[in-house]
Amino acid sequence: MKKITLLLLFLTNLLFSQQAYYNGIDFTLTGEDLYNALQQRISNYNQNFTYGDARDVLVFTDENPSNPNNVLLVYGYNDTDGNCTTDRSRDKLDFGGLSCEYNREHVFARTLPVPDMGNVNNSTTGIGADPNNLRASDQQMNNNRGSKLFQNGSGTAGDVGSGNWYPGDEWKGDVARMVMYMYTRYGDRCLPGLVGVGNLQGTTQMLQTFLEWNATDPVTSYEDQRNNFLQGAYLNRNPFIDNPALATVIWGGPQAEDRWGILSTQDISATSFVIYPNPSVNSEISITSTATIDAVVFYDINGKIVLDLIQPTKSNNTIYIANLPQGFYLVKISSENKSITKKVLVN
């Protein structure tokens, strides 16, 4: 048996917020089981966070990555047409309720949950102040949207159908992932069918439209920026920003981007590959198989690739892993355009 010896240098400057946040969740779960696991995790939040705090953090969460003096405005699309209602970006100092100022948009509109969120003021806490549901928006654009339900469309934001709302090509993925967060965080109080129109995905309560938006409009660095900041301020995260493929695993629909590279459908028989010993002994892992192994990728539980082997010598391989921190890893084995992911514990 040919051996491959690898020394992995662990980078101490890696960010571990996601690793720590999702630690203990079994990502081999699917459907309602994974939904429940994520719901339990994100239900822990900063109970003292107010609607006023949400206003104050907008200048950080919604900062324009291209211009740190500005915030991005949800539904906005044109900064040069002379119409401030359609602005995509605005000076951070221009917060308020007047023309050409921006305010806080509840993407899952306040009146739509059952029961609804009620009136809000700067002292409000709870669902009405949840910053994962709030975006900077031009005040007139916010009024134009109001409590209209989301509906599929194309192009820029505006009215579609019979009094419904399309958030715009740029923002539809953001909206979908926020709706998914709200449904996961607050359950049946925020059913997707209360905030959007269209067909349900199979026997689930998720709208096909939101699954399509999630799959076709990938996560941006702006969404990551919001998620990372809000974990510090609000103490939870939006899992569907961290990995849109979680939605596919839970509700089905079109395959969304798997940002961790570990949630793809496992279409190789689990008996085709054996990883041993597991837990590992002295950081040594053996992979045996009668099939050709095209690639072996090790991920930490933050979804970070720590080892990537391409065509690692025939079908029987011994891989030595040194200097890895103790913990769980996911090993993705690819063979003939198929893959399977298995857990490994490094002691």
Task: Locate the predicted segments by residue.
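Bacterial Sec-dependent N-terminal signal peptides
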Residues: 1-21, 265, 341
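Boundary/junction segments of secreted and surface-exposed precursor proteins
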Residues: 17-40
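Low-complexity, Pro/Thr/Ser/Gly/Ala-rich linker/spacer regions in secreted
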Residues: 19, 254-271
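Domain-level detector of nuclease and nuclease-like folds
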Residues: 96-103, 107-261
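C-terminal outer-membrane/trafficking sorting elements
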Residues: 268-347
